Swiss-Prot record:
SUPFAM superfamilies: RNA-binding domain, RBD. Residues 18-96, 106-182, 199-276, 302-378 form the RRM domain. Binds the poly(A) tail of mRNA. May be involved in cytoplasmic regulatory processes of mRNA metabolism. Can probably bind to cytoplasmic RNA sequences other than poly(A) in vivo. It comes from Macaca mulatta (Rhesus macaque). The gene is PABPC5. It holds the Pfam family RRM_1. CDD domains: RRM1_I_PABPs (cd12378), RRM2_I_PABPs (cd12379), RRM3_I_PABPs (cd12380). GO terms for molecular function: mRNA 3'-UTR binding; poly(A) binding; poly(U) RNA binding. Keywords: Cytoplasm, Repeat, RNA-binding. It comes from the Eukaryota. InterPro entries: Nucleotide-bd_a/b_plait_sf (IPR012677), PABP_1234 (IPR006515), PABP_RRM1 (IPR034364), RBD_domain_sf (IPR035979), RRM2_I_PABPs (IPR045305), RRM_dom (IPR000504), RRM_dom_euk (IPR003954). This is Polyadenylate-binding protein 5. It is found in: Cytoplasm.
Length: 382
């Protein structure tokens, strides 16, 4: 329980502007220590150290609620980065409504900071441009990691800071200051950039007789290549896919446009921009999330669909092929008059298992045919 007078629930809004967030606290700091530290600034209603709900260990931050907003403002302006237990703490206005923080409006990102610039220096460097809701130099055990975030209470203040500070030299280092971007936005920009510059091409559903030389012959007409490789298993057998790296993006793009969907020796090629595994998994996750949001409730199972099944594959064999990726609740080959129709479904217990199966099994030859494996639409019953 915090020190001082408790905050009556019915009067919460009245004291909203008199509450301060206190961050970067030493684990040994208590409510009483906070109370004694801030009491000289003015009458307090209560102090609170936030703790883990299970272990009750302190989380490194807390709140100080003053009786009067003027006292809270005085403390914010004069006590920020003071010491408790030998460690400087950060102060900012308490923001119970986190919509502004989550919106990203007014938030900026700073990188290439000198290690000597701490939270205090950052605050005073940027406070000239507007009211700061929060500022934080990101650190690890070795100190500053060279980047930071400053959140202003308005977009105009953030734009002023970017205009005046981007490219400025601080302690002989030229800093970058720009608008904060959420991870999803940064990833989208990387994807857009990669699509406009890629030189590495992924090719799948190639025949067993296609080796590096034959693959090069097929792709070299579009431009000079740096490397061509058919991927093989431990026994030397082709896995049915490979990579072609061109010297220029234009050649790679032309090859994709011309060869994707083309039939070679009865096999329809897939030709596209080569993606890193983490990018493929992220794309699968995004697609799954879009499908999941269409459902009213979370389904108990995650289906994947398999096409181009060999005629010899039955339910048992299908489950066996996919069992290494996780817990399977259902594996079914679609039948017609006792004959497999060439496609089936496998239901996993989690999205992670299903995603891994798609990533590893799509294009793999099982029996005599390369599989076409995709995430299915989540349903109430799998």
């Amino acid at each position: 329980m915090g020190s001082g007078e408790p905050n009556p629930a019915g009067k919460k809004k009245k004291y909203l502007k008199a509450a301060l967030y206190v961050g970067d606290l030493d684990p040994d700091v208590t409510e009483d220590m906070l109370y004694k530290k801030f009491r000289p600034a003015g009458p307090l209603r209560f102090t609170r150290i936030c703790r883990d709900p299970v272990t009750r260990s302190p989380l490194g931050y807390g709140y100080v609620n003053f009786r009067f907003p003027a006292d809270a403002e005085w403390a914010l302006n004069t006590m920020n980065f003071d010491l408790i237990n030998g460690k400087p703490f950060r102060l900012m206005w308490s923001q119970p409504d986190d919509r502004l923080r989550k919106s990203g409006v007014g938030n900026i990102f700073i990188k290439n900071l000198d290690k000597s610039i701490d939270n205090r220096a950052l605050f005073y460097l940027f406070s000239a441009f507007g009211n700061i809701l929060s500022c934080k130099v990101v650190c690890d055990d070795n100190g500053s990691k060279g980047y930071a975030y400053v959140h202003f209470d308005s977009l105009a203040a953030a734009n002023r800071a970017i205009w005046h500070m981007n490219g400025v030299r601080l302690n002989n280092r030229q800093v970058y200051v720009g608008r904060f971007k959420f991870p999803e936005e940064r990833a989208a920009e990387v994807r857009t950039r990669d699509r406009a510059t890629f030189t590495n091409v992924f090719v799948k559903n190639i025949g067993d007789d296609i080796d590096d030389e034959k693959l090069k012959e097929l792709f070299c007409e579009y431009g000079p290549t740096e490397s061509v490789k058919v991927i093989r298993d431990a026994s030397g057998k082709s896995k049915g896919f490979g990579f072609v790296r061109y010297e220029t993006h234009e050649a790679a793009q032309k090859a994709v446009l011309d060869l994707h969907g083309k039939s070679i020796d009865g096999k329809v090629l897939y030709v596209g921009r080569a993606q890193k595994k983490i990018e493929r998994l992220a794309e699968l996750r995004r697609r799954f999330e879009r499908l999941r949001l269409k459902e009213k409730s979370r389904p108990p199972g995650v289906p994947i669909y398999i096409k181009n099944l060999d005629e010899t594959i039955n339910d048992e064999k299908l489950k066996e092929e996919f069992s290494s990726f996780g817990s399977i609740s259902r594996a079914k080959v679609m039948m017609e008059v006792g004959q497999g129709k060439g496609f089936g479904v496998v239901c996993f217990s989690s999205f992670e298992e299903a995603t891994k199966a798609v990533d590893e099994m799509n294009g793999r030859v099982v029996g005599s045919k390369p599989l076409h494996v995709t995430l299915g639409q989540a349903r109430r019953r799998c």
